[in-house]
């Protein structure tokens, strides 16, 4: 195979991945959890989209997140934060999934968005 076809193959792979990442939302799809209360009761790997505030940093990349229904731990890697400062008054939308282990549940955050 010639190298001139490599960009075309890479583009096809990229666009097909973006389409798959959107996910299925029709009948039989796993519903997205939208509150801390529901996330605390959800199964492992349940998708979540939560809106509220990051109250404090507990340690490392573990933070306490709060919405109108309660609070829980969330894990946010530095590269997942937006390029602006966030404090305990900033409303954010967290997208991720429930991470359940022997100690309890936390949210493994994949994306942080500031709500204006």
Curated annotation (Swiss-Prot):
It holds the Pfam family BOF. Coiled coil: none annotated. Keywords: Periplasm, Signal. Its main location: periplasm. One of its GO terms (cellular component) is periplasmic space. It comes from Pseudomonas aeruginosa (strain ATCC 15692 / DSM 22644 / CIP 104116 / JCM 14847 / LMG 12228 / 1C / PRS 101 / PAO1). InterPro entries: BOBF_sf (IPR036700), BOF (IPR005220), Ca-regulated_OB-fold (IPR052401). Transmembrane segments: none annotated. This is Calcium-regulated OB-fold protein CarO. NCBIfam families: stress_OB_fold (NF033674). GO terms for biological process: calcium ion homeostasis; response to antibiotic; response to cadmium ion; response to calcium ion; response to mercury ion. It is found in: Periplasm. Disruption phenotype: Does not affect growth at high Ca(2+) level. Does not affect the basal intracellular concentration of Ca(2+), but impairs recovery to the resting intracellular Ca(2+). Increases sensitivity to tobramycin at high Ca(2+). In strain 25W, increases sensitivity to tributyltin (TBT), cadmium, mercury, acidic pH and hydrogen peroxide. Strain 25W was isolated in the ocean, whereas the reference strain PAO1 came from wounds in infected humans. Residues 1-21 form the signal peptide. Disulfide bonds: none annotated. Plays a role in intracellular Ca(2+) homeostasis. Involved in cell protection against oxidative stress in strain 25W. PANTHER family: PROTEIN YGIW.
